Amino acid sequence: MEKKVSAIPQPKTYGPLGNLPLIDKDKPTLSFIKIAEEYGPIFQIQTLSDTIIVVSGHELVAEVCDETRFDKSIEGALAKVRAFAGDGLFTSETHEPNWKKAHNILMPTFSQRAMKDYHAMMVDIAVQLVQKWARLNPNENVDVPEDMTRLTLDTIGLCGFNYRFNSFYRETPHPFITSMTRALDEAMHQLQRLDIEDKLMWRTKRQFQHDIQSMFSLVDNIIAERKSSGDQEENDLLSRMLNVPDPETGEKLDDENIRFQIITFLIAGHETTSGLLSFAIYFLLKNPDKLKKAYEEVDRVLTDPTPTYQQVMKLKYMRMILNESLRLWPTAPAFSLYAKEDTVIGGKYPIKKGEDRISVLIPQLHRDKDAWGDNVEEFQPERFEELDKVPHHAYKPFGNGQRACIGMQFALHEATLVMGMLLQHFELIDYQNYQLDVKQTLTLKPGDFKIRILPRKQTISHPTVLAPTEDKLKNDEIKQHVQKTPSIIGADNLSLLVLYGSDTGVAEGIARELADTASLEGVQTEVVALNDRIGSLPKEGAVLIVTSSYNGKPPSNAGQFVQWLEELKPDELKGVQYAVFGCGDHNWASTYQRIPRYIDEQMAQKGATRFSKRGEADASGDFEEQLEQWKQNMWSDAMKAFGLELNKNMEKERSTLSLQFVSRLGGSPLARTYEAVYASILENRELQSSSSDRSTRHIEVSLPEGATYKEGDHLGVLPVNSEKNINRILKRFGLNGKDQVILSASGRSINHIPLDSPVSLLALLSYSVEVQEAATRAQIREMVTFTACPPHKKELEALLEEGVYHEQILKKRISMLDLLEKYEACEIRFERFLELLPALKPRYYSISSSPLVAHNRLSITVGVVNAPAWSGEGTYEGVASNYLAQRHNKDEIICFIRTPQSNFELPKDPETPIIMVGPGTGIAPFRGFLQARRVQKQKGMNLGQAHLYFGCRHPEKDYLYRTELENDERDGLISLHTAFSRLEGHPKTYVQHLIKQDRINLISLLDNGAHLYICGDGSKMAPDVEDTLCQAYQEIHEVSEQEARNWLDRVQDEGRYGKDVWAGI
C-alpha cells in the first residue's frame, strides 16, 4: 500500500532571501528553536544556497539516526570549516578514506581506560586554574567562558600533543585562540551572505586566510618538533598519528591529514568542553539546591588536595549535572545528515537521496515533552540517575552512531574533574544576577558570563609538584598482582580476530570466551560481529568465526558478511587462516548448521586456509561437551599452525575476577547491551481455568514513546533471578545481600557483570548471571580443583565421565549451586563462582497483539514453568515466566523489541491465504495476526482464507483465548481447527492429526501461493507438522520424499513459510 506523503511545513519566505530574514546571523540556533516551537518537530528552511530540513521530534530523530538509511552530511558551516580542518574526523565524509583510517587509529586513545593515562595531565592544568582563582583579590571578577577556554585548550594541547599553550600565564588569549575564534565566526557568517556580498569582502577574506595560515603554522611546528625529537616514547594522539598504521589498510596518516586532525582536536577538544563547564556553573548558580548536593558529594569524595582518577569516577552526581547541562544547552547544537536512498520519515515526509539536507536540532530535541515530560525547561540532574531510563534517541549531545564525538569520554572526565576541583576549593557567587545570553560560533556558550569566588578551604596557592604516578603505581601494583607465567610460549606474537553471528547472545558469548582465553596468554585479540568486518580479513594471525543459524538464514548481525563472502572472487582470501564453530539444533534437520557450514565452505573456496576442522554443537544434545571438545582440538591445531609451544612451568590458573567490599551503589550493564527500556505492566491475568493445574498468563505492557512493533515481533524480557535462589547463594558463601562490592577483571572482558563501580550483592545476583542452568563440565572441573575432601573430589570427578554427566546433570538439570550445596567441602571462592556463571539471558516472547489496535501497548502470552524438578527434589520454577507471573499492575519490567529473521509477518496482500499452526502459547503471534485482520476487514479490505490450527489439553481447562477465537470464526476472520489431547472419551489429538485430515485443501492452498506459519514447540510439534505436510505433498503429487522436502524448502526460500519456535540457539 503506497504511503501518503505530506509537504514539510515551512515558514513564510521573503523572495530570493527565502527564510533568511527569520534567522539571526549571530544566533541561528536560537532562531531555529523559535521556529520549531511554532512549526513542530519538522520544518524546512530556505537559505540563499539550499533548503534545510530541521528535525527535533525524538521519533523522527530515531528514524534519521538509522545509519542504514542516513549518514552524516558535511554541509553548511562544517563545509566552510573544511577550509582549515580539511578531512579531519569532524569535517570528513564517512566515505573518505582518511575518516575511517583516522577513526581506527585514534579510537583506543579515547577509551575510558585511556582516561587513566590522561588524568594526571588533566590535573596539571586544572591546578593552574585553581591557583589563578586562589590568587584573585577580593571582588575581582572571573570571566567563566574565557577561563574555561584557557583550561580546555591547555588540556587538549598537553594530553594530545604534549604541547603547552600556557594560557594561564598570558594576559591575552593565545594567538591560536584568536585566529580560531575569528575563523569559526567567519565560517558561520559566510552562510548568511549573498554571493555578491562575499566577493566584495576582500579584507575579511584576507583575514580569514591569514588566520588559517596562523593555525597551520602552529600545528606544523608541533609536528616538526615531535619528529625532530624522535618521538621519545610518547603515547599520545600525535604519537599514534605519526607511528601507528590503520589496522585495516596498514597505511599511516600523511602529514597534511595529521595537521587537519590536530586542528580538529584543538577546536572540538576545547570549544565544546569550555561551553559545557560554563553552562554547568551557570545552572548550579541558578539552582542552589543542586549546588548544595554537588558540594556535599565533592566534600564526601574528594578528600585529597588533587583528585585521583578513582575519586573522579565516584563523582556520580557531578556527572549527572554535566549531562543535564548538555541536555538544556548542548554545546554542539546540531548535526547534519543525508539520505542514502529516497525514503519517507514519519510515515509521510519524503526525503530525496543526496539532495535534502537534514539538520537535527539538538536543543529542541532535548526539550521534546513527549520524551522528557512537561518540565523540560527545569534543571533536573536527577533525570540521569538511572541511565537506562534516559529516553532512547531523545538525548544526542555528542551526535549519533559511528560519527558521534570520539572524544566524549575525554570531555566528560575532564569536565567532571574540573567541576569537582572548583567546588572543592571555592564558593561560587552570582554577584550580578546574570541572565543567560547564549553566544554562538560553531558551538554554544554563555556570553559575558562573570562570577566571583571565595575560598572554601586551603587551596593550592603554590606550584605543586604533581605526582602523576599515584594512579599509575596502583595500576602497576594490580598488574604485578595478576601477572602469571604464560602457559603458551610465543602467544604474545600472535593476533586473533574472533567474529560472531548471534541473535540470542549464545554465539557471541562463546566468541568472547575464546578471545578471553587467548588474551590471558598474551594474544592480541579483537571481538566483533561478522557484519562489522565486511571488506577485509587479516592475513596475519588467526580468524575464528562462531555463528548460529536462524531457520536456515544468517543471524541479523551476519547477513551482510555472508553476502560479501558470496561476492568475493576465488583466492581473494588467500593468506587468511581460520576456523569455524557452529551452534544449532538437530531438531531442524533441514537447516541444521546451514550457515556455519556455508561460511566454512565459502571461506575455503575464496582461498582462506582452514587451520582446524569446523566444530558443531547441538542445543538438543550435549552442547557444552561438544564445545569443549572442539576448543581443545582447535587450540591444539592453532599451536601447530602458528608454531607455539606449551610452557611446562605454567602456574595453576586462578580467578581473573577480583572483589572488594565497599559502601556505595552501582548498576547492571545488561540493559544497555540490549538497548532495553522500562515498560509498565497494564494487565496480568490468568488464561487457564481454575480447574487446571497449570498456568498461562496474559500480560499487557505499555510502551515508552518512540517504541514501535509489528505483528510477529518478539518482546525480549530481562528477567530477575528468584529471591529463593539468591538467598541460597548468599547462605552458601556466608554473604549479606545488602553489602556493596566493586568487581574488577584482569585480562578478560566480562561484559555482563558491572565492573569498577559499586553494586550490591543482591542486585549483582538478581540481574547479571544465570544461577539455575545445568552445571557445565568446566564448572564441575573447577569444583574438583577446589575440593580437598577425597570422597567428595572422587564423586565430582565421576560426574565428568561419559554418560554420567548426561544422565545425572543434564537430564536432571542439576545446577552448580545444587552441587555446591551438596558438596560443602568445595572451597571455591565467591568471585570464581560468579565468574563461572554465564550471563543472564533475555527471554523472548512472541507478541500476541497488533499495533493497529493499540500502538502504545502490547501483550505477550506466558506459559508459567512450575513443576516437579527433574532431579526428584523440590520444584523447578522457570526464571522469567515466574518473574513475569508475579508482576502487578504498574510494576516495571526491562524489555526490548526484536524482529525475528524468519518471514514471520502477515503477507503484504491481505487477500493471500494464510495457514497458522499454533498449539498452546504458540497461539500468541496469531492473536496479533487476527487483530490486524479484523482492522483490515473494518476498513473494507478483502481478506484471503485463513486457517488456524490450535491445540490444547482440554476445552474446559486450557483453551486459551477461546471466546476471542470463536468470535473471530463467527465474524469470518478464520476457519478454526482445534485439537484436544486430554479430552475424556476421545483419542489424543494433536494439530498434525487435523492437518493430515485437511491435507488436500492445505496442499492446494500452498500450491497457489498461501503462506504457512508455525509457532510453538520446536523439538516435537513443529517437526511433526513439517513431516505431515511433506507426506501429504508426496502423496498428492506422487513425488519422492526428497522432492517433498525440497518443495517445503522452496516455500520457505520464497518467504512463504515462517517459523517461530522455542528450540535452537
Swiss-Prot record:
GO MF annotation, one: iron ion binding
Cofactor(s) recorded in Swiss-Prot or TrEMBL: heme; FAD; FMN
Heme among keywords: yes
Presence of the UniProt keyword Flavoprotein in the record: yes
EC numbers, comma separated: 1.14.14.1, 1.6.2.4
Positions that bind FMN: 502-507, 549-552, 583-585, 591-593
Organism of provenance: Bacillus cereus (strain ATCC 14579 / DSM 31 / CCUG 7414 / JCM 2152 / NBRC 15305 / NCIMB 9373 / NCTC 2599 / NRRL B-3711)
Annotated spans, Cytochrome P450: 1-479
Annotated heme binding sites: 405
Superkingdom, natural source: Bacteria
Site-annotated residues for Important for catalytic activity: 272
Domain Flavodoxin-like, chain residue ranges per copy: 496-635
Domain FAD-binding FR-type per the UniProt entry, residue ranges: 674-907
Catalytic reaction equation(s): 2 oxidized [cytochrome P450] + NADPH = 2 reduced [cytochrome P450] + NADP(+) + H(+); an organic molecule + reduced [NADPH--hemoprotein reductase] + O2 = an alcohol + oxidized [NADPH--hemoprotein reductase] + H2O + H(+)
Phylogenetic lineage: Bacteria, Bacillati, Bacillota, Bacilli, Bacillales
The name this protein goes by in its record: Bifunctional cytochrome P450/NADPH--P450 reductase
Cellular component, GO annotation: cytosol
Function summary: Functions as a fatty acid monooxygenase. Catalyzes hydroxylation of fatty acids at omega-1, omega-2 and omega-3 positions, yielding primarily omega-1 and omega-2 hydroxylated products. Metabolizes unsaturated and saturated fatty acids as well as N-acylamino acids. Has a preference for long-chain unsaturated fatty acids over saturated fatty acids. Shows activity toward saturated fatty acids with a chain length of 9-18 carbons with preference for longer fatty acids.
Family statement drawn from the similarity comment of this UniProt entry: In the N-terminal section; belongs to the cytochrome P450 family.
